Amino acid sequence: KAFEAAILRNFGGLEDFERVLIHALRRSCGQRVLLSLMADDTLWLICTRAEADPLGAVLLDLAAPAAPCTEEALALRVRVIDWRHCARRYEEVLAARHTS
C-alpha cells in the first residue's frame, strides 16, 4: 500500500503513471526508463542512456524499444510489469534508509 500511495502522490494514480510510463518508453527510443526513489522519498521517472549510472534507488528498469512501437504494444509491456516486485523494492529501500 505504501508504494501505491507514493505513486498516487507523485503521479496521480497507477493509471496515470502507466500513461506517463508508456509515453516515456515511446520517447526514449533505445534508452532505459527508470523509476527511481530519490533521497527525499519522491519517485522520479528518468530516461537515460543504457550505460549511465542511475539516480536514486531504482525500483523499475525498462529498456525502451529501439524502434517506435504502437501504443498497444507499449501498453501491453506496461501491463505485464510485476508491480509487487516494485512495491517490495520500495519497502526495502525505505526500510534501509530509515534504519541507517
Language-model segments: which ranges?
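Feature for soluble, non-membrane regions of globular proteins
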Residues: 1-100
